[in-house]
Design a protein with these regions (language model features):
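Metal- and O2-centered redox machinery and metal/ROS homeostasis
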Residues: 1-221
């Protein structure tokens, strides 16, 4: 299978990695009134994209370039995700993504990664797993960074639609308008190193940490 086909298959919403069970803090922000309606949603998505490109996305970029650093990057990701909701969601998504990728693609490199996570009792966070999996499948790092940002944006937009903040057509229009920004951030992500990791959205982090205390919730995080 060519790298392009692999990209399309992983980007397909039918790829069963469990990402749609998570809202990346949007549900908590919605209930807290930080996102009030469709008019305030674009700003939330834009700052969320920037935060991902300067935070968790860097872990994916580093393991996409240097998968042999997976253990080190995975441990750093665990330290970075210091709110328990985001940390738990990242581990759940990462282990699900690795398991599904192994079952679907049957790559020897993916199998070795799965054994490493189990043998060393690593966390298996989503971002480093994502990058290492793309490297194992022969997807070049710039394409992996673009795929990461696309999937992050698509996940946020999908969450907004399911929460009823916007409708499906408005959601797709919003995704289209934000795509150039996501593309720009993917370029920044590709050039980033571990020393560049930073939390640019502490309020978002606090809101996401309160997700477990919501009276009613649609998403796991």
């Amino acid at each position: 299978m060519t790298p392009d086909w692999l990209l399309w298959q992983i980007a397909d919403s039918a790829f069963p990695a469990g990402g749609f069970a998570h809202s990346a803090g949007l549900e908590a922000a919605w209930q807290a009134g930080q996102v009030r309606d469709g008019d305030s949603l674009p700003e939330f998505l834009a700052v969320g994209l920037s935060a991902a490109a300067r935070g968790v996305g860097i872990f994916a970029a580093v393991t996409a370039r240097t998968p042999q650093r997976f253990g080190e990057v995975d441990a750093a990701c665990d330290l970075f995700l210091n709110n328990h909701v985001a940390n738990r969601a990242s581990v759940a998504q990462g282990q699900a993504f690795l398991r599904v990728a192994n079952e679907i693609f049957g790559s020897a490199a993916l199998e070795r990664l799965g054994k490493l996570v189990r043998r060393e009792r690593l966390f298996g966070h989503y971002s480093p797993v994502f990058g290492a999996c793309t490297a194992a499948l022969g997807i070049d790092p710039p394409a992996a960074c673009r795929l990461f940002m696309f999937m992050f944006l698509r996940g946020l937009v999908s969450s907004a639609v399911r929460l009823g903040i916007v409708g499906p057509l408005e959601g797709q229009s919003l995704q289209c308008r934000l795509s150039p920004r996501a593309e720009e951030l993917a370029g920044i992500l590709h050039a980033a190193s571990m020393e560049d990791v930073v939390q640019t959205l502490p309020l978002h982090d606090l809101l996401q940490g309160a997700h477990d205390r919501l009276y009613s919730r649609l998403f796991q995080s």
